[in-house]
From Swiss-Prot:
Organism name: Drosophila melanogaster (Fruit fly)
UniProt cross-references to InterPro entries, sorted A to Z: NADH_UbQ_FeS_4_mit-like, NDUFS4-like_sf
Gene Ontology CC: mitochondrial inner membrane; respiratory chain complex I
Name this protein carries in UniProt: NADH dehydrogenase [ubiquinone] iron-sulfur protein 4, mitochondrial
Membrane topology: Peripheral membrane protein
Family to which the UniProt record says this protein belongs: Belongs to the complex I NDUFS4 subunit family.
The gene coding this protein: ND-18
Length: 183
């Protein structure tokens, strides 16, 4: 037999096998109205279970205005009259380069402070005065403040870093005519 004939016989045999499998599957398939096989989880379930599954499979909608202040545990007098400053913290003066300059931070306004008579420490009755929370963007910080019921304001904006001109290094660039040849 030639190679072409062998390939034709194989493809014909595989086509016949495919058609036989398809016919057998059609015989064993469900006689449901959609024509497809039934899911065993739904076929054997009681109507109450199906109704409960349909309720649980739906989407849960949350109102857009979420107020976390009643469940945060912070006293009411610290929530009502607070004002939050959203800002970019200044760059560290140590040798950290530009590390931690791309974050936004919230900071609360100052409340009454007094000097502790025993130790001389600065004291405050405000639990939120020393809390600093960092965020990746001002929008995240604004959302956080609104959910907690605090008034806020954005102080300063993100300033893009200027590209510095490197004057001295340009003198030794390989593609400039300022280099003096030694020969």
């Amino acid at each position: 037999m030639s190679a072409l004939r062998q390939v034709m016989c194989r493809s014909t045999a595989s086509l016949q096998l495919y058609q036989a499998n398809r016919a057998a599957a059609a015989r064993w398939a469900s006689t449901a109205t959609d024509g497809g096989p039934l899911d065993p989880k739904t076929a054997l379930a009681r109507p109450e279970e199906l109704e409960q599954r349909n309720k649980l499979s739906g989407k849960i909608t949350v109102p857009t205005a979420v107020n976390l202040s009643p469940i945060s545990g912070v006293p009411e007098e610290h929530i009502r009259e607070r004002r939050v400053r959203i800002h970019i913290p200044p760059k560290n003066a140590m040798q950290s380069g530009t590390d931690n300059v791309n974050t936004w931070q919230i900071e609360f306004d100052n409340r009454e402070r007094w000097e502790n008579p025993l130790m001389g420490w600065a004291s405050s009755g405000d639990p939120l005065s020393n809390m600093n929370v960092q965020f990746g963007s001002p929008e995240e910080a604004i959302t956080f403040c609104e959910r907690n019921g605090w008034r806020w304001y954005v102080d300063g904006a993100a300033k893009p870093k200027k590209e510095r001109v490197k004057n001295y290094g340009i003198n030794f660039a390989w593609n400039k005519r300022t280099r003096v040849s030694t020969k």
